[in-house]
Amino acid sequence: MQQAFHDIKINTNGQGFYDFTKQTISWVDKQKINNGILNINILHTSASLVIQENADPEVLVDLKNFFNKLAPMDNRLYKHTTEGKDDMPAHIKSALTNNQLTLSIKNKKLMLGTWQGLYLFEHRIEKHTRTLSHHLMGE
């Protein structure tokens, strides 16, 4: 079994979805591993990872709006408000989604459906640089 590690940095411009599918595919393609498992972790607690539709951008708009209603930016609702009105809502959204993704790799290809993409889901309203740690294992 072989292993490979890689970090992808994504600069966000505030709340929303940031597609990192192409960066991940490009990195996997350069590895000596043809078949295996890829684990991706986000090294933050106020953003998350999702596999979501990549064909219709309205899906991402609807998801963002849904989560903003589910965890509103209202400091009267929360005790943890250290970093502003989006602080605790960002942690709630992160807890309800994923901080890691696991994907099968077959013949150097990510096993994703036709309309699936890999997204960083930024929950904060300010710009951030997010780190996505990739760990590929296989043969």
Regions found by a protein language model. Give the residues of each.
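Active-site histidine-anchored catalytic micro-motif
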Residues: 1-139
